[in-house]
């Protein structure tokens, strides 16, 4: 006698113990639904299977073959003689970019079909469980009502998920795949073909000719991220404490003045600062007029000066954000602890060290991690302020103040080295993801949340 089938029964057991229509549903999708008079649902499953196999033969197999080879015939020109006249004609060839994209799209299409196939098996199992328990098999209208009520959220997510697959997952996988090809300025598509080269691009970045650029930029990127995050966090808290000092007059006015920088678009502030700090800008002109300097200070043209200038300008932009968050936290701190500490004779510094700062850090720890990762990928400050300059002849397609993310941009737009840019993108993600996980799981915010 066959065992009872439930909605959680493993599919291997369902195939072994199931009825003939359930077993055949593993080969012919929707058969169990058709046998149980769910004609609409069964036909949809069956048509999905037929459409997949037709597409598999006509489109998917050639697309997967093209993704493996990335093309065999280059586009070019040939001489053709017509009525004794030699003409130059274009020779059609393969496009490695399109072959890779179509191949990846075919894999995603196969994954979607695999999910539909799994839904077919779950439906067959559910029908058998209903029949064994003596319950009524719902028709299509009743199934649709269930979808519109209990699983309405799944229906709403269908179109967004398709959009995510097409416009997020597919480009992301495409970018990752480029890291394993030789798609660079020597192999410009579609004119030339590029090939799979394995991990050679990673070796070129980490050990080859690019290592002399990658590791100095990685070091500067981490220094910048730490300095930018720490300065805006510390001085933002200090400013918030000053603005919340008892007896300070015109608090709202002072707070508004500091928040004005937030109202100005960031790129506008950065471009203004770029003009303000250049060799012939207002600041250097003022310093020379006052005879404080003999010549212009290279705020943006000397590597060391430029790095300090970037950090200070970022403080100007970032401190007000931290000040606002810290102000909200300080205004909602329990006053009982602070008053008790004051009665016990604690100084303001001791109160800040033992009460105020720990509670601010507890609340802002996730935000700090986010700011650090954001600064690793802070494209705007570098691009609009220095453009990555000043130039450095020892670097490949990078300047002295370039971050990894701005270097990635130059490798893509200027150098056309898409494979190397893809490698840099993967390494940036690995660094950011590793730090985020390690920092967050060790933060007090995570430990307190996990303890609840």
PLM-predicted stretches and their roles:
Residues 17, 49, 74-77, 81, ...:
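Glutamate identity and glutamate-enriched acidic tracts
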Residues 72-89, 190-191, 391-398:
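Intrinsically disordered, low-complexity coil segments
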């Amino acid at each position: 006698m066959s065992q009872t089938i439930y909605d959680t029964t493993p599919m291997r057991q369902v195939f072994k113990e199931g009825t003939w229509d359930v077993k055949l549903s593993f080969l012919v999708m929707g058969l169990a639904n058709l046998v149980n008079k769910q004609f609409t649902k069964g036909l949809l499953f069956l048509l999905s299977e037929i459409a997949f196999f037709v597409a598999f033969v006509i489109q998917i197999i050639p697309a997967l073959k093209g993704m493996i080879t990335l093309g065999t015939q280059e586009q070019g020109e040939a001489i053709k003689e017509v009525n004794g006249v030699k003409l130059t004609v274009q020779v059609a060839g393969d496009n490695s970019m399109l072959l890779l994209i179509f191949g990846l799209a075919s894999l995603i299409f196969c994954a979607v079909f695999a999910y539909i196939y799994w839904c077919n098996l779950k439906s067959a199992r559910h029908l058998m469980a209903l029949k064994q328990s003596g319950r009524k098999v719902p028709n299509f209208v009743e199934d649709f009502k269930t979808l519109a009520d209990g699983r309405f959220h799944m229906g709403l997510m269908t179109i967004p998920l398709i959009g995510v697959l097409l416009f997020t997952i597919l480009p992301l996988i495409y970018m990752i795949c480029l890291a394993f090809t030789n798609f660079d300025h020597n192999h410009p598509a579609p004119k030339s073909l590029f090939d799979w080269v394995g991990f050679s691009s990673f070796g070129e970045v980490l050990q080859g000719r690019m290592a002399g650029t990658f590791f100095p930029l990685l070091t500067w990127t981490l220094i910048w991220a730490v300095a930018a995050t720490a300065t805006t966090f510390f001085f933002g808290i200090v400013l918030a404490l000053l603005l919340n000092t008892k007896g300070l007059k015109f608090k709202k006015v002072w707070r508004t003045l500091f928040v004005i920088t937030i109202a100005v678009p960031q790129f506008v502030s950065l471009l203004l600062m770029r003009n303000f700090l250049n060799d012939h800008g207002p600041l250097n002109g003022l310093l020379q007029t006052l005879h404080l300097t003999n010549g212009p200070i290279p705020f943006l043209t000397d590597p060391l000066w430029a790095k300090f200038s970037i950090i200070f300008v970022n403080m100007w932009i970032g401190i007000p954000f931290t000040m606002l968050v810290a102000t909200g936290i300080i205004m909602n701190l329990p006053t009982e602890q602070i008053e008790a500490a004051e009665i016990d004779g604690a100084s303001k510094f001791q109160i800040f060290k033992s009460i105020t700062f720990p509670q601010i850090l507890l609340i802002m720890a996730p935000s700090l991690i986010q700011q650090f990762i954001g600064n690793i990928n802070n494209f705007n400050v570098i691009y609009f302020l220095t453009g990555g300059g000043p130039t450095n002849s020892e670097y490949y397609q990078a300047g002295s103040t370039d971050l990894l993310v701005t270097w990635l941009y130059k490798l893509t737009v200027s150098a056309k080295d898409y494979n190397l840019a893809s490698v840099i993108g993967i390494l940036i993600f690995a660094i950011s993801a590793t730090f985020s996980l390690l920092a967050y799981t060790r933060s007090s915010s995570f430990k307190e949340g996990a303890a609840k």
